[in-house]
Amino acid sequence: MSTIGVVLDEDRLRSMADDLGKVPGVRAVALGGSRARGTHRPDSDIDLGLYVEADVDLTALAEAASGWTGEDVEIAGRGGWGPWVDSGAWLIVDGAPVDLILRDVTRVEDQCARAARGEFAFHSQPGHPLGFLDVAYAGEVATGVPLCDPDGILVALAQSMTPYPDALRAAFIENLWQVDFLLNAATKGAKTGDAAYVALCGTTAAMLIAHAWHVAAGQWVTNEKGLVPNVARLPIDTAGFSAAAAAVLGSIGTAPEELLASIAQLRGLPRPATPSD
C-alpha cells in the first residue's frame, strides 16, 4: 500500500501523543522534523519525538504503538540506532509513515545548555555523513510542536533557545576556519587525482559554510539533508551560495587539473561575514 500523501490530522496525533504520555518514563511528546517546520513533502514521514527518562518502559511503549498499528511493534533499546539518534521505531499508522524517535530528556537539557554557551560538535552516527550535530537536540525543541507536555518541559526549553543563542551563532561563524583547512588538504589529493578525497573535503566544506549561513539567519539545523539547497530559502541575502555550491559539487571532476579548479571554486563560495571582516 502506498503511503505517499497519507497524513494524520492533529486530533489523531494528539490522541497518539496522549497514549505515549501515559507510559511510565515518557515526559513529553512533540511533532518534529519537516512537518513541524512546514517544509515537508507529501511523502515525508511524521516524526514524533518522545522525551523520556533513562528508565522509560519500552514494553509499555511498544504496546501503545501496537494499539495503533494492529501488529506487534519493537522499540529499539537505548543506543539501538546509534549513540545520537538513539532509538525508536518505524511504524505505519492508518496508512501513514510514522517515526517514533526517543530522546533522553537529560541529554536534551544538557545540549540546550551547551548551545547557550556556544558549544557544539559533530559525532559519528549511521545515516549522518557529516556527523550528528549534538546541539540539534536544542534545535529540535526550538522548532518542534509540543503535543503532550504536561510539565511544560518542551515549552521551557524552547523558550530558552529562542531567539537563536548569540554564543552559538558566533561559534559556528568562527568555525569557518575549517573550510580553508579542508580545502588545503584537498589540494594535495587533487594533485594525485584522488577525486573521492577531494569530493569528501569539498562537500564537508560546503556543509560547514551552509551551517554558518543558517546561524547567520538565526535558523536551527537538525539534519544535514537539504542543508546546502535550503540556504537559498533563508530570509537573508546569501549571495547565490546554494546554486554555486551545487554547480561545483555536481561536477567536481576526476583529473588533477579539474579537481584543482573545483577547489578554487569552493574557496570562492560566498560565506557569511566573520567578526573580523
Language-model-detected regions and their locations in the chain:
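Conserved NTP/Mg2+-binding pocket subregion across the NTase superfamily
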Residues: S2-G5, T69-A190
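Hydrophobic, Leu/Ile/Phe/Ala-enriched alpha-helical segments that form helix-helix packing faces
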Residues: L20, A65-V73, P270
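Conserved nucleotidyltransferase catalytic core and NTase-mimicking acidic/glycine-rich helix/loop elements
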Residues: P146-D277
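Helical scaffold of the NTase/Pol beta-like nucleotidyltransferase catalytic core
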Residues: M1-L31
